[in-house]
């Protein structure tokens, strides 16, 4: 996939290759309707309000509270991204975690304990997309 985006041939791409080999085969995510609802609602909230990207809603509700309200009580995380080109590019950038030394997005995507997911996106400004990926262990 990185061949489709030559500017992404960066040091993080090599570390991603290594992490993918180290992780080995991972189970497929199961779509969780609650996580889809949460991810889409958060994306729409941030996008429609043109708010600064973040894990808290525009009303101040944090990620943990949003998950608890849906009955997801443990083992959950969220990735967010903004892209002006495509949703696919947003996901690739989350795996690469360019300029993010803690590699938090990548760790979430490669965590074998996170088995359920929901994804949402919304237009962010004129030509960008705000992508939200919510993950949880099997509840």
Residue ranges and their predicted role:
Residues 34-138:
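A well-ordered secondary-structure block
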Residues 1-49:
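A short alpha-helix/helix-coil micro-patch that ends at or immediately precedes a cysteine
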